[in-house]
Swiss-Prot record:
The gene is pdxS. It comes from the Bacteria. This is Pyridoxal 5'-phosphate synthase subunit PdxS. CDD domains: pdxS. PROSITE patterns: PDXS_SNZ_1 (PS01235), PDXS_SNZ_2 (PS51129). SUPFAM superfamilies: Ribulose-phoshate binding barrel (SSF51366). In the presence of PdxT, forms a dodecamer of heterodimers. The active site is at K80 (schiff-base intermediate with d-ribose 5-phosphate). It comes from Herpetosiphon aurantiacus (strain ATCC 23779 / DSM 785 / 114-95).
Amino acid sequence: METSTFTTKVGLAQMLKGGVIMDVVTPDQAKIAEEAGAVAVMALERVPADIRKDGGVARMSDPEMIQGIIEAVTIPVMAKSRIGHFVEAQILEAIGVDYIDESEVLTPADEEHHTNKHNFKVPFVCGARNLGEALRRITEGAAMIRTKGEAGTGNVVEAVRHARTMFAEIRRLQTLDPDELFVAAKNLQAPYELVKQIAELGRLPVVNFAAGGIATPADAALMMQLGVDGVFVGSGIFKSGNPAKRAKAIVEATTHFRDAKLLAEISRNLGEAMVGINIDTIPENELLAKRGW
């Protein structure tokens, strides 16, 4: 039963492949995202840039606010729970969100355990900086993986690092013989069967999106050309000068990511991009990607 449920959840996440998922804080923003062609929206009270700026403890959003967004659009709605906060996840499942993001953008509730995602019918998405983190999340029941990037910075460098790291580690697995795969599984702290499956597939067995710092159509196309299955755009759209136009351009860039002429065309006159942050100016203890294990 558990296996078939997991397969169903992976299949639901698969339906988002090739698309853009946008952070929205109001029903109106959700409508703009839907009209621009987003495959799903992420309902939250504050985009990561504001969470980063405001500090304090970031928790699950008010169910009333999430409900308002669910009612405003026809596309799937995601919402974030804190790492390890399985009760927030239970609440999100109860109000009918389509996917739950167990997110390092919110303040972790448990420093040792992530949520056991097999206990839920709703599919989970989780962040990962490398193959080991991705495999541990999949083992816990994640139906979708995304790079952690460094959310709220408008700086794509960490998302690029995480994607390249993961793809390089997968390529390395493909060169190993069966005996060496046992050692690799031990080093990755992941089940041998899963490691073996990835070596055979040459990719993760679930969809793998890019997230964290994607602010322009070029950023989205870069991540797609690196080999991810789709992109999350958080602060990059509604912190920019012309959200509707930028949202549409990022969707087009994600679809036509190899067409440089089109990318040039849709990158024109988008208004001000969000103000970015250089990662090396962020104090170590404020880096969101380091949360989770």
